[in-house]
């Protein structure tokens, strides 16, 4: 469906206006279903880490938009598929996790969704389902007889996730090869148990989603639809959700609300309007006003983006604390208890530690070499004073109010605290 096409349903109108839609199967049928009643839709998330990161946020926001439009979201946790590992976009096999690791990861991920969705027993309340419930019950022969007949190896070999591995002569295990069948069965099971008619996901999941749509229509002759979002990258082409210091996690245990706020504050100028549409609930007319701010005033829009995104993920208080800490640190030069802290053994600081090493250890630079280049370019500060020599030794003599304040560029600060 073209970008100019007009939808009748509030749900698809919102997705289109805010830039979420990449591809849709059966768009007219889906639009009619969403305009005529409650649509139940799901997105699957494998439990490969104890949190999700910003790279998954567009999918979380899709479920939020679905619920805001009066429909029912299903968060499908891949307790079963995580045991296999999604080969999509991977050059090598994932490390297999134990059942205990998967359960712990699911518990961490549940905390994320509670901030974005309303869960409960109502007709449009979100529910969380684990595909291990049905996948673990299948006998191998039964699974092949019931579902293997609907998939040809010819077609499976044509999927990008498989084809790219083979072209690069990189091994793919038979375990991974089965992933697409398992994901297709997820849709069928959710359709039967919960009346789910729509699977959503990133555009890299298009093939897997098509499998589920076609399996559900072929086996049970039920309505089934698929919808994908564009793969998200910054204006400069960087992968969304990754920084020099690592992944931008959505759980406070993995990344502080302050660092989360700073991630959004550091958004490139060209991305501000797009990210406000995708990652905040601000009205479109207000977003249009913010993205039109001239010159340096665009920084005000970035602060609004950071405020709104952090409020959604961490709550109003944490968003306010993060902004206050940033303003104190960068605009007033003051210390704040809400700034990120890196703890170091008091004996190690007393003996002295090379600044480049400290920068890398504290997450202000990806490596010692990066820290040295940053210092040479004037981007390193110790206690608010520029330090061009990354080889200089930091000791307890540098303590101010019990900490050493390190800054990388204009927007990243860590307080080094001896313990």
Curated annotation (Swiss-Prot):
UniProt xrefs under SUPFAM superfamilies: Alpha-L RNA-binding motif, Nucleotidylyl transferase
InterPro entries, per the entry: aa-tRNA-synth_Ic, Rossmann-like_a/b/a_fold, S4_RNA-bd_sf, SYY-like_C, Tyr-tRNA-ligase, Tyr-tRNA-ligase_bac-type, Tyr-tRNA-ligase_bac_1
Leader sequence residues: none
EC number(s) on file: 6.1.1.1
PANTHER family: TYROSINE--TRNA LIGASE, MITOCHONDRIAL, TYROSYL-TRNA SYNTHETASE
Location of the motif 'HIGH' region: 47-56
The keyword Secreted appears for this protein: no
Reaction equations catalysed: tRNA(Tyr) + L-tyrosine + ATP = L-tyrosyl-tRNA(Tyr) + AMP + diphosphate + H(+)
Protein origin, superkingdom: Bacteria
Sites where the protein binds ATP: 242
NCBIfam families according to UniProt: tyrS (TIGR00234)
Segments crossing the lipid bilayer: none
Domain S4 RNA-binding, chain residue ranges per copy: 353-418
Protein name, per record: Tyrosine--tRNA ligase
Chief site of localization: cytoplasm
Annotated residues for binding of L-tyrosine: 42, 179, 183
UniProt record similarity statement: Belongs to the class-I aminoacyl-tRNA synthetase family. TyrS type 1 subfamily.
Keywords annotated in UniProt: Aminoacyl-tRNA synthetase, ATP-binding, Cytoplasm, Ligase, Nucleotide-binding, Protein biosynthesis, RNA-binding
GO MF terms held by the record: ATP binding; RNA binding; tyrosine-tRNA ligase activity
UniProt source species: Caulobacter sp. (strain K31)
Motif range ('KMSKS' region): 239-243
Taxonomic lineage: Bacteria, Pseudomonadati, Pseudomonadota, Alphaproteobacteria, Caulobacterales
